[in-house]
Amino acid sequence: MTMARVLVASRNAKKLAELRRILDDAGVAGVQIVGLDDVPPYDEAPETGATFEENALAKARDGAAATGLPCVADDSGLAVDALNGMPGVLSARWSGTHGDDAANNALLLAQLRDVPDERRGARFVSACALVVPGGTETVVRGEWPGTIGRKPMGEGGFGYDPLFVPDGGDVTAAQLTPAAKDAASHRGRALRHLLPALAALADRTE
């Protein structure tokens, strides 16, 4: 069977592994996931959208146009109730340096220092886009509600996972197994919404 190559517009190995696990768990065969390190470099547009959906779609369009491959891209972040939904689309660079998880977590804790437990509600949000060259564009969204803890806990995950306690649980996202996180997380929920479109790509190669 010919494999449908699908580009994920990311160099984050954990994101690539997450989508591969979700495809495997859903029994979707015939899709080969590749990341940005597996294709020739191209100019990546900055994330300037006002919403997660705008950023995800822009990244997916860029990847599909540059490589000729169907491209999946996501934009995700943390929306904290007490901060009026921030850091939102600025989540990865909340402290001023893109991708500095420790600094971002430290700043968030400082901003919520005097916020009582009952007002520490938050949700992870993920928008995922799939763009097929010369074909369809699909944009989906997943949300994961919870609260922000008082200190980082757990070694797994990335981003704000060590601070985020999902609703109905007593451990942080960073303390969950990969399988448990896939089943519940915002990105897992969004990616599962893309499964029919990804399965259709696999069907086209049979």
UniProtKB/Swiss-Prot annotation:
Keyword Magnesium belongs to the record: yes
Class in the EC hierarchy, top level: hydrolase
Residues given in the record as substrate binding sites: 10-15, 76, 158-161, 181, 186-187
Keywords from the named record: Hydrolase, Magnesium, Metal-binding, Nucleotide metabolism, Nucleotide-binding
Recorded GO CC terms: cytosol
Cofactor notes: Binds 1 Mg(2+) ion per subunit.
CDD domains: HAM1 (cd00515)
Disulfide bonds listed in the record: none
Cofactor: Mg(2+)
Pfam families per record: Ham1p_like
Record flagged with keyword Acetylation: no
InterPro entries per record: dITP/XTP_pyrophosphatase, ITPase-like_fam, RdgB/HAM1
Residues holding Mg(2+): 75
GO molecular function term, any single one: metal ion binding
Record-level GO BP terms: nucleotide metabolic process; purine nucleoside triphosphate catabolic process
UniProt record similarity statement: Belongs to the HAM1 NTPase family.
Described purpose of this protein according to its UniProt entry: Pyrophosphatase that catalyzes the hydrolysis of nucleoside triphosphates to their monophosphate derivatives, with a high preference for the non-canonical purine nucleotides XTP (xanthosine triphosphate), dITP (deoxyinosine triphosphate) and ITP. Seems to function as a house-cleaning enzyme that removes non-canonical purine nucleotides from the nucleotide pool, thus preventing their incorporation into DNA/RNA and avoiding chromosomal lesions.
HAMAP family linked to this entry: Non_canon_purine_NTPase
Oligomer and partners: Homodimer.
The protein's name in its UniProt record: dITP/XTP pyrophosphatase
Organism: Nocardia farcinica (strain IFM 10152)
